[in-house]
Regions:
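Active-site-adjacent structural elements that line small-molecule/cofactor binding pockets in enzymes
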Residues: 1-306
Length: 306
């Protein structure tokens, strides 16, 4: 079981104490010392005010923030959790991801999703109804660019040309983890990704997130079995990461967090086939964040390995 922790910037407004270079450096180094494999940042370039008022969050740009993180520690990996593929032109995304992977020496995992906030698509001038087609097209472009094949375009005068952003990434390929609970998501993972990120999704939130309910181990077990079936049908025998957000025991940093309950739930998820746990923190200052990360490392990560 590997662990990741979110940089504490997924708030609205993004707190000043969490968003400086010094804060990102301190949190990343604390995470590495506590035994976390990676740090992550979410992606909301233009969140609608109505969603924010209802409890949504802003964030730093993931590619910029994670570049600061890789400079803070020589070993920790970084994850976009997750980048909505429809928000960016795929050639721009391929360039950003390859640049971060090159700067980090091959430490990026590209977590991606289809997206569910229609108003954010509207703000960016992108068709929400075409998000699935744009997602699949983006995967095609990323694959072609990173393999060195490039993408053929038609210029304004009618001539064709090949576009191949340079430099290429260090990893061949950059691992892609796809987030979401739908069967279509698991099919994409089985055919063309290196990992799957299912999300806890109680029935009360399913309409907002436009994703199937995942509320407990029975749902998770059923979804994992479905993924394995699809992987077998795709003829793959390479390992696929399954990275969850284990909710049991509460949120680290909150007054009611129960490390023992959380740890037992992680063990149960591992028995189902989960290979990683992404942790989001409930913290209110840099000092609080560093303390919670250290205690999680001792009470959860360290306790499981002892």
């Amino acid at each position: 079981m590997r662990f990741g922790v979110g940089l504490p910037v997924a708030h609205h407004p993004v707190p000043e104490w969490a968003s400086s270079l010094e804060a990102i450096t301190a949190v990343t180094r604390a995470a590495a010392a506590a035994g976390f494999e990676h740090v992550f940042v979410t992606d909301h370039p233009a969140p609608p005010q109505r969603w924010l008022a209802a409890g949504g969050h802003s964030s730093l740009d993931p590619f910029v923030a994670l570049t600061a993180a890789v400079a803070a520690d020589p070993d920790i990996r970084v994850l976009t959790n997750l980048s909505v593929l429809g928000y960016r032109h795929p050639l721009v995304l391929a360039k950003s991801a390859a640049t971060l992977d090159r700067i980090s020496g091959g430490r990026l995992t590209l977590g991606v999703g289809v997206g569910y906030l229609a108003a954010e698509f509207d703000a960016l001038g992108v068709s929400f109804d075409e998000r699935n087609d744009r997602f699949d097209h983006a995967l095609d472009v990323l694959d072609a660019v990173w393999r060195g094949q490039g993408v053929e375009i038609t210029e304004g005068d009618g001539r064709t040309s090949v576009v191949l952003p340079d430099p290429p990434p260090v990893q061949q390929p950059i691992p892609i983890w796809i987030g979401g609970n739908a069967g279509r998501t698991r099919q994409r993972v089985a055919e063309r990704a290196q990992g799957w990120m299912p999300m806890p999704n109680p029935a009360a939130f399913a309409k907002t997130t436009r994703s199937p309910v995942l509320d407990g181990p029975d749902d998770l077990s059923r979804f994992i079995a479905d993924l394995h079936r699809r992987v077998d049908e795709a003829g793959r025998d390479d390992p696929i990461d399954i990275v969850f957000v284990v909710p049991d025991g509460g949120q680290p940093g909150s007054a009611g967090f129960q490390a023992d309950v959380h740890r037992r739930a992680i063990d149960e998820c591992a028995a189902l086939g989960v290979t990683g746990n992404n942790v989001t923190l409930d913290t209110t200052s840099l000092e609080h964040t560093l303390d919670v990360i250290g205690r999680y490392g001792a009470d959860v990560i360290g306790a499981r390995s002892s």
